UniProtKB/Swiss-Prot annotation:
Recorded topology in the membrane: Peripheral membrane protein
Reaction equations catalysed: phosphate(out) + ATP + H2O = ADP + 2 phosphate(in) + H(+)
GO MF terms held by the record: ATP binding; ATP hydrolysis activity; ATPase-coupled phosphate ion transmembrane transporter activity
Function: Part of the ABC transporter complex PstSACB involved in phosphate import. Responsible for energy coupling to the transport system.
CDD domains reported for this sequence: ABC_PstB_phosphate_transporter (cd03260)
Organism: Acinetobacter baylyi (strain ATCC 33305 / BD413 / ADP1)
EC main group: translocase
EC identifiers of the protein: 7.3.2.1
Subcellular location: Cell inner membrane
Annotated gene: pstB
Presence of the UniProt keyword Repeat in the record: no
Protein name listed in UniProt: Phosphate import ATP-binding protein PstB
First-listed, main subcellular location of the protein, grouped into a coarse class: membrane
Residues the entry annotates as binding ATP: 88-95
Statement: the UniProt record of this protein carries the keyword ATP-binding: yes
Length: 303
């Protein structure tokens, strides 16, 4: 069930924070070409057993931009504490679909969504639903790191202060420290919490954004190409973090990297021209796909 959080308009009063920023609220496999398919080393990247508790579900979801249909009636169930990867060629609708899961498409005037999206069996498109609360419960990490123009501490503390999650400054300090620990960043920044978050490296900034998301106690974390702007070392740290976070959160990640999907996800969903073509365990999708379109994509024949 969704927790009660006090909401205010204080974010809107801070003109130094952009509108997009306000929407926030390991062991590697060798995944490479081998013949026609991507090899999938289950020994080096064991996948956890995903419990069949449905956290998010969509039913006949369509998304329109004006008269153009971007998502064509998708049904999908996302399980609690799983990592599910959305893959597909550019323009296939995977990011658009991801944004329906916490109503980020509401910010686009020409966008219209039909169908049902349920979080713990509650319709998130119910007109009486508090969207600010929803976006705290279903957090978003964007493609480009977008720290607030504030200190490292204030970046993480901003959400808890906004939502009234800390009783006093000691509570707030504990939330900030715990969130930075969970994001794998505490040891790197604990002695410079008052320095600007924008002064961190790209990989550190992305982990700071993840800490900021964690700080408001989400149940689901959506990630839209979170590593596309990062170097390989920073990418490896974020991927390891995803694995650790999945013990506490449900994670959906959009990625153009099939190798990344193979490394981090329990299940993979393949999108093509607004349709959900196939969803199955990541191992099966990459080694024995059911659909010819999936096979063509993962073997590099298009996309």
């Amino acid at each position: 069930m969704m927790n009660t959080i006090n909401t205010t308009n204080s974010l809107e009063k801070d003109n130094t924070v952009t509108s997009e920023q306000l929407q926030f609220t390991g062991a590697e496999t060798q995944s490479k070409r081998q013949g026609s398919f991507v090899s999938f080393d289950t020994q080096t990247a064991p996948k956890k057993d995903v419990k069949n508790t449905i956290k998010l579900s969509t039913s006949d979801v369509h998304v329109y931009y004006g008269e153009s249909e971007a998502i064509k009636g998708i049904d999908l169930e996302i399980y609690e504490n799983e990592v599910i990867a959305f893959i597909g060629p550019s323009g296939c609708g995977k990011s658009t679909f991801l944004r329906t899961l916490n109503r980020m498409n509401d910010t686009i005037d020409s966008c219209r969504v039909t169908g049902k999206v349920l979080l713990d069996n509650q319709d998130i498109y119910d007109p009486n639903l508090d969207v600010v609360l929803l976006r705290a419960q279903v957090g978003m990490v964007f493609q480009k790191p977008n720290p607030f123009p504030k200190s490292i501490f204030e970046n993480v503390a901003y959400g808890p202060k906004l939502h009234g999650l800390a009783r006093d400054k000691y509570d707030l300090e504990e939330i900030v420290e715990n969130s930075l620990h969970k994001a794998g960043l505490w040891d790197e920044v604990k002695d410079r919490l008052n320095q600007p978050g924008t002064g961190l490296s790209g990989g550190q900034q992305q982990r700071l954004c993840i800490a900021r998301t964690i700080a408001v106690s989400p149940e689901v974390i959506l990630m839209d190409e979170p590593c596309s702007a990062l170097d390989p070392i920073a990418t490896a740290k974020v991927e390891e973090l995803i694995s650790e976070l999945s013990t506490q959160y449900t994670i959906a990640i959009v990625t153009h990297s099939m190798q990344q999907a193979a490394r981090v996800s329990d299940r993979t969903a393949y999108f093509h021209l607004g349709d959900l073509i196939e969803v199955n365990s990541t191992e099966k999708v990459f080694t024995q796909p059911d659909h010819q379109l999936t096979e063509a994509y993962i073997t590099g024949r298009f996309g």
